UniProtKB/Swiss-Prot annotation:
It comes from Drosophila melanogaster. GO terms for molecular function: CRD domain binding; DNA-binding transcription factor binding; HMG box domain binding; transcription corepressor activity. Residues 206-267 are annotated as: CCN domain. The lineage of its organism: Eukaryota, Metazoa, Ecdysozoa, Arthropoda, Hexapoda. Residues 198-233, 254-283 have a biased composition (Basic and acidic residues). CDD domains: WD40 (cd00200). It comes from the Eukaryota. This is Protein groucho.
Amino acid sequence: MYPSPVRHPAAGGPPPQGPIKFTIADTLERIKEEFNFLQAQYHSIKLECEKLSNEKTEMQRHYVMYYEMSYGLNVEMHKQTEIAKRLNTLINQLLPFLQADHQQQVLQAVERAKQVTMQELNLIIGHQQQHGIQQLLQQIHAQQVPGGPPQPMGALNPFGALGATMGLPHGPQGLLNKPPEHHRPDIKPTGLEGPAAAEERLRNSVSPADREKYRTRSPLDIENDSKRRKDEKLQEDEGEKSDQDLVVDVANEMESHSPRPNGEHVSMEVRDRESLNGERLEKPSSSGIKQERPPSRSGSSSSRSTPSLKTKDMEKPGTPGAKARTPTPNAAAPAPGVNPKQMMPQGPPPAGYPGAPYQRPADPYQRPPSDPAYGRPPPMPYDPHAHVRTNGIPHPSALTGGKPAYSFHMNGEGSLQPVPFPPDALVGVGIPRHARQINTLSHGEVVCAVTISNPTKYVYTGGKGCVKVWDISQPGNKNPVSQLDCLQRDNYIRSVKLLPDGRTLIVGGEASNLSIWDLASPTPRIKAELTSAAPACYALAISPDSKVCFSCCSDGNIAVWDLHNEILVRQFQGHTDGASCIDISPDGSRLWTGGLDNTVRSWDLREGRQLQQHDFSSQIFSLGYCPTGDWLAVGMENSHVEVLHASKPDKYQLHLHESCVLSLRFAACGKWFVSTGKDNLLNAWRTPYGASIFQSKETSSVLSCDISTDDKYIVTGSGDKKATVYEVIY
């Protein structure tokens, strides 16, 4: 009656589902996944940007290298073209002097020489490349030798070994038809890895403290460095308002750099100066004063100038002001032979490291002094400590890098050669090992003159308008024991001299009068004043018998004073510009003077005449005569120290200073001497060949120095208003 129930309903589609619902946790999870994806993408893009930045830096370095190489090629091409033109002209001029048959042969040979094929060029350049690769392999081997200094890559031929390491085309061969066998199968091009590898080797070869200076800088580093430089510039601008640093007053100052091993470089500033015209004594005075004048040189200027020492604050003195002058016709020309400036790196980077960024010189035929000579092998270095090296360590002169020579010998023919130092150059009796600073005397003004008493007890420092006396026998004493007010308040004292008895002090400076002080009285007092016609005195010397005083005047004259009668007895005339420095021989028979006229002159004190004249290419700022030998050391404005023999043409030229050599003094033993300069350096040298004994760097220009009579102490006066006392360690 009722239908049976359907036990198994027919199969149909799934029941319809409701709308999908997302929970908050699912949404946050999806956001997190998208954020992680974007962060990974950002990190990838950031890495790509850094990679592109590094590639950009590498490309810029390559661009500089290519530019330097192309410019060098251009200069060399013009040079060779000019040489070829001159040689061709010379051949054409000499042809008429040959016989007719010989003329034809020469013409044919010249024409054959002009026919240079591409195959010959490829062959020649291939040989040059092989030679450059061999040189590179030798240098790589030399770098691996223990005890050897890092190799200076900047001195390589840019088209030889350097091109091989950089993966650059070798010279102009990239412009020629290259045969398939151009590249050697065993040499693989390094592409962009060359500069990075060279840079890594450089960073590994320097000390850890200096490694970061030679790494590739990212744009962020450059930006930070720019901000840091702005901050430093603001600090420097504020510091310039003070007169802490004395600036030597040289009109033709140039930034010359010495190849010192530590590679330190001090920037130099040029300051203007004012000139005071001084009248020169031309006629005998009514008091019967003798005036000795040697025959004047042809072309010498008759006008004299007395330089005033002017600085930023219009108060600081410097060396006798350098006056721009036209060389006289018979001035010494540069000697033929080796130019020491070409034998040494001249830029700020330390020796053995690549040079500074290339700067194109103004003259296309003039190579910048800091660039290595193309095609010229680097100089053979010089090692002053060869005697202490073991046999297992090779001498650095066998390598192409290392400490450059700084001492050169000039023979009678005028050629300069590096000096081979003897084994006892830095050892032996009377040769110090170093100097230790033991005291600082805060004078309060720029210290332009210093001297030490005998026995060593007092130090006299001359500044602006006064001389201060210090007792250095008590190291803890920081105050002067007395103050001697000299000259005028605003005039700087340029020289102070003690008589051997220690009872009399003579003071000269930027005034026409010399002050003679009696130190034996209970209170030091001025017992006499000597007045000259010159407005300033630059240097003083005392005869061994203490009877005569010699003063270098700003008008070029050398005044001779009788200290007993306190009168002027004679004037030596010859310098055509201010006389800046002076010294006397131990026997008192000969006087040596240096001047701003680029000359050093010797005078016979018995006969009252000039004996010799030495012409230089730079102004003379300091000199000293060896107490035990016939050697005269001269410090010059161009940073050189030259040691001359009094009677022979031999001389030595020393190159460790980076700026003007402002003072110089021999030790009493005569075996060594010291020099100071505007580069803040105190250098000690071996007599006469100039082996560097020790070196000390101060914080400002070192204007003056003196050595005690027992050779145990050195005193220096500097532009930061203090004097420094050193103990010499033997």
